């Protein structure tokens, strides 16, 4: 049954027999699609594929967890890694939607973007903002941020997106692009409490 196979896959992994572990995990996925181990097994498969740059296979494994929804304890990390799998395939728009999904999930948990949470939470959120900045800088900068949120709806953390994008450009010494990022936010949100700070940059 699935528990026997699951234990077998763990045993193989612990002694470094990764290929055998993968073969067993693939059996679990095919033969026991309702297994209670499915999300963990799919996450381990996703990590295997991702580290070997098999991003399409990784995407498929992570997506199967995301499709389960927040009921899975692997949901958030799978959503994040799904974003990266798409990003590595240069599917920037699809990747952005997944990374924004990570931030949306954080909103539902009551995460405070100003104060942050635990070190692990803050690191993942910071990394998510960083890769979102990379994605928007690859696809046209602040105007693509405007387009994205016009299409997908406003978010409470939009200010962080613009701020991180501006900071990303500053690090690259792209000063005009940095200024455009801050000014675009101010233009769209003139009454936001951060707007005066952005206006001075």
Language model segments and positions:
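Acidic, polar-rich low-complexity tracts and alpha-helical solenoid repeat scaffolds
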Residues: 1-201
């Amino acid at each position: 049954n699935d528990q026997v196979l699951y234990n077998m896959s763990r045993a193989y992994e612990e002694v470094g027999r990764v290929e055998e572990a993968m073969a067993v995990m693939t059996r679990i996925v095919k033969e026991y699609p309702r297994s209670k181990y499915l999300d963990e097994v799919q996450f381990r498969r996703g990590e295997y594929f991702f580290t070997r740059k098999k991003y399409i296979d990784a995407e498929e494994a992570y997506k199967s967890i995301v499709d389960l929804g927040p009921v899975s304890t692997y949901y958030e990390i799978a959503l994040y890694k799904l974003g990266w799998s798409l990003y590595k395939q240069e599917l920037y728009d699809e990747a952005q939607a997944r990374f924004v999904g990570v931030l949306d999930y954080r909103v539902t948990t009551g995460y405070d973007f100003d104060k942050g949470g635990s070190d692990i939470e803050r690191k993942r959120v910071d990394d998510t903002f960083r890769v979102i900045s990379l994605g928007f800088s690859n696809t046209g900068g602040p105007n693509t941020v405007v387009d994205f949120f016009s299409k997908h709806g406003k978010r409470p953390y939009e200010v962080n997106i613009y701020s991180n994008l501006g900071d990303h450009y500053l690090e690259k010494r792209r000063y005009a692009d940095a200024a455009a990022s801050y000014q675009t936010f101010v233009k769209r949100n003139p009454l936001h409490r951060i707007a005066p700070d952005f206006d001075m940059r």
